[in-house]
């Protein structure tokens, strides 16, 4: 379903369902022979949600039991799992690196089913603020409580749509804008219109004193090319058709949730505003972690840049 200005969702709908897809990929990676990451809660979320498009990623036996379907989408599923594994490792290492510099205030924007507040070894005194849609945070908190999980940092949930005045909600919840902060915007930007992307980073910039850190993944140049968009839509439609034969549930058109618009280059913008930023392509990240690089651009993972930035003292 195409996006609207004030749309909202539960964990199994719209953008919320993509969080389950990410969790399913993390579960599959965690349970693989040589995992890049360890996320013990990913499987918990997937099992709590029941069957859906995410089942294709979380349950390899589904594909193994249907070889004619596996031949169509098996490689694409593996590509998605590899991408999510390397993405997760990138952000895990970012947060632990920021903590090593003494940062004790963390903000995870559009946290979805991110479980870093429960699974990373945060230093004593760390406060983690998580922002997302109310029903998404409710599902995550309730599911983890039912399994006896306890945060490894002081956790503050802020149920809010990021199209609203989230900086005010963050400040009202105890966030200290005078302290260095580690920010993440993981898997978020492509779901925002271009102007909303600009506003997001303007707000982060305003709330970030010297010593702050930022990590995000953003659409790579060419993301909005009409021919590439068309080919990606066709490929995703084939994947949905195959998935629909594995689980008896309608597959949402995830690509319709993206905004294929020309955007401000984030790393350049940050550099112009006092940050030291670097960008890594998804292909470079896959290579760094020893995962194969897809030989085409129209698969389930659009061209992506991973940006990390630090604001030094003036």
Curated annotation (Swiss-Prot):
Lineage: Bacteria, Bacillati, Actinomycetota, Actinomycetes, Mycobacteriales
Species, as recorded: Mycobacterium marinum (strain ATCC BAA-535 / M)
Binding site for S-adenosyl-L-methionine: 132, 161-162
Keywords annotated in UniProt: Methyltransferase, S-adenosyl-L-methionine, Transferase
Record-stated family: Belongs to the UPF0677 family.
GO MF term set: methyltransferase activity
A Pfam family hit: LCM
Known role: Exhibits S-adenosyl-L-methionine-dependent methyltransferase activity.
Superkingdom to which the source organism belongs: Bacteria
Name of the protein in its database record: Putative S-adenosyl-L-methionine-dependent methyltransferase MMAR_5323
GO biological process terms held by the UniProt record: methylation
UniProt xrefs under PANTHER family: S-ADENOSYL-L-METHIONINE-DEPENDENT METHYLTRANSFERASE YKTD-RELATED (PTHR43619), S-ADENOSYL-L-METHIONINE-DEPENDENT METHYLTRANSFERASES SUPERFAMILY PROTEIN (PTHR43619:SF2)
EC numbers for this chain: 2.1.1.-
Gene3D superfamilies: Vaccinia Virus protein VP39 (3.40.50.150)
């Amino acid at each position: 379903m195409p996006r609207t200005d004030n749309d909202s969702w539960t964990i199994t709908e719209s953008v919320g369902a993509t969080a389950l897809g990410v969790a399913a990929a993390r579960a599959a990676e965690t349970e693989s022979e040589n995992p890049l990451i360890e996320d013990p809660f990913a499987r918990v979320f997937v099992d709590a949600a029941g069957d859906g498009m995410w089942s294709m990623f979380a349950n390899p036996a589904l594909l193994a039991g249907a070889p004619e379907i596996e031949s169509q989408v098996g490689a694409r599923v593996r590509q998605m799992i590899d991408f999510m594994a390397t993405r997760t490792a990138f952000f895990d290492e970012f947060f632990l690196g920021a903590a090593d510099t003494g940062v004790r205030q963390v903000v995870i924007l559009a946290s979805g089913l991110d479980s870093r507040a429960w699974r990373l070894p945060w230093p004593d005194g760390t406060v983690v603020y998580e922002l997302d849609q109310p029903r998404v945070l409710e599902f995550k908190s309730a599911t983890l409580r039912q399994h006896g999980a306890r945060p490894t940092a002081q956790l503050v949930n802020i149920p809010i749509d990021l199209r609203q005045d989230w900086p005010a909600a963050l400040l009202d919840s105890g966030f200290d804008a005078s302290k260095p902060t580690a920010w993440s915007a993981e898997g978020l930007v492509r779901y925002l219109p271009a102007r909303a992307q600009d506003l997001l980073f303007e707000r982060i910039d305003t709330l970030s004193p010297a010593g702050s850190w930022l990590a995000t993944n953003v659409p790579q140049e060419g993301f909005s090319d009409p021919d590439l968009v068309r080919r990606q839509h066709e490929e995703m439609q084939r994947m949905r058709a195959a998935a629909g034969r594995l689980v008896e549930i309608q597959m949402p058109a995830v690509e319709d949730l993206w905004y294929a618009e020309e955007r401000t280059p984030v790393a350049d913008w940050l550099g112009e505003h006092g940050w030291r930023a670097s960008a890594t392509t998804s292909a470079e990240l896959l290579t760094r972690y020893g995962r194969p690089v897809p030989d085409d651009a129209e698969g389930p993972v659009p061209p992506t840049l991973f940006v990390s930035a630090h604001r030094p003292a003036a």
